[in-house]
A protein has these predicted regions:
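Cleavable N-terminal signal peptides of Sec/SRP-targeted secreted and luminal proteins
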Residues: 3-19
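Catalytic-core signature of thiol
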Residues: 16-63, 67-374
Length: 374
């Protein structure tokens, strides 16, 4: 008898599963399914098949529901499926709930300044050109390749990629684009900086590490998007078929002066003179999900939560709108092949800072030390 009941229960479970995933219109089966899976939407007798696609590797288990940000859902058809099939992209406001930029309270930044900045000279504004783009200076590109911080798994490492993206380019500028072009390792910084991690960090975590210990090139420790221990092997290592080992002699990339710069004209002078800079922005879900190209504007007042690198500026010929040229770290599939443009503070007769996610309020520069490279 027990065996028959077990077989009957198994049969009902199989039928229920088939009905749930093949939209079988059977009221009795729906009742069975509701007992097993819970009730359906009241507006539909059979719930359309949904796949939950997580867009943030985020563990909610240790948080109360009161601390959670709203969940934004976007529903679209699955390619190649029936009309009733839908994919539900569960999009948490990751930058509001867990920003990849973490500003620690009462932290003292160890800025280094041994010579005046370009924007500290009287009358510097007169020499600022109308347009500047380090991707194309007289036909020469000084910018390093675009990266994706979110592969092979999600990692809140924008603080690394925004900072090193600008710094890679500055090494190329300082060395006049001579071979080899610079590509420092974000993973080594995550492993060995001592502060930031895949749960977030700060520009200072990168530049203080570069000043004190020096950075290593990408081939020393390829990006894995995880938190690892700082070992000699994770500093710079390699492997043979039968063993792995730490490399003893490798190039280190140091910086000299580093500090903060704010404001449109100061930023322009710093960028034109020495190369791209790292800037914080208050990234919004709309920017994250909807930007595909063009000059971005959005009125918002979010706290800074993301780091990007600003490589130049320009003016739209049709609208005469001035914009920043910015590299993100979400891969080439996002935006304008991984880049975006956003209005400067001149937008709407000087109201642009309300529409550009605060990109001009908190930026950082670092001057490469190339004395050991050439």
């Amino acid at each position: 008898m027990n065996a028959r009941l077990a077989l009957f229960a198994l049969f009902l479970l199989v039928v229920a599963c088939q009905a749930r995933y093949h939209n079988t219109p059977n009221r009795l089966v729906n009742v069975i399914i509701s007992k097993i899976y819970g009730s359906f939407d009241q507006e539909s007798s059979v719930e359309p098949r949904r796949r939950h696609v997580p867009t943030d590797e985020y563990d909610d288990s240790d948080e109360s529901t009161e601390d959670k940000a709203p969940v934004h859902r976007i529903v679209s058809a699955i390619e190649g499926s029936d009309e009733s099939d839908e994919v539900e992209v569960v999009q948490p406001s990751r930058y509001l709930r867990r920003p990849c930029l973490i500003k620690r309270k009462n932290r003292r930044y160890n800025f280094v300044k041994s010579y005046p900045r370009p924007w500290e000279h009287p009358g510097f504004e007169a020499s600022i050109p109308k347009e500047w783009d380090w991707r194309n200076v007289s036909g020469v590109n000084y910018c390093s390749p675009n990266r994706n911080q979110h592969i092979p798994v999600y990692c809140g490492s924008c603080w690394v990629f925004g900072s090193t993206g600008a710094l890679n380019d500055r090494f190329n500028v300082a060395r006049k684009n001579r071979w080899p072009q610079t590509m420092v390792s974000p993973q080594e910084i995550i492993d060995c900086n001592g502060k930031g991690s895949c749960q977030g960090g700060d520009v200072a975590d990168v530049y203080e590490h570069a000043k004190k210990e020096g950075l290593v090139e990408e081939g020393c420790n390829n990006y894995k998007a995880v938190n690892e221990k700082c070992t000699p092997f994770n500093r710079c290592g390699s492997c043979w078929p039968d063993n792995c080992f730490a490399i003893q002699n490798y190039t280190r990339y140091f910086i000299k002066d580093w500090g903060q710069v704010q404001g449109r004209e100061n930023m322009m002078a710093e960028i034109q003179s020495r190369g791209p800079i790292a800037c914080s922005i208050g990234a919004t879900p709309k920017f994250d999900l909807n930007y595909t190209g063009g000059i971005y504007t959005e009125k918002s007042n979010l706290t800074s939560n993301h780091i990007v690198s600003v490589s130049g500026w320009g003016v739209d010929k049709e609208t005469n709108t001035e914009f920043w040229i910015v590299r993100n770290s979400w891969g080439e599939a996002w935006g304008e092949r991984g880049w975006f443009r956003i209005v400067t503070s001149t937008y709407l007769n000087g109201q642009g800072n309300d529409f550009n996610m605060g990109i001009e309020t908190d930026c950082y520069f670092a001057d490469p030390d190339i004395s050991n490279l050439d």
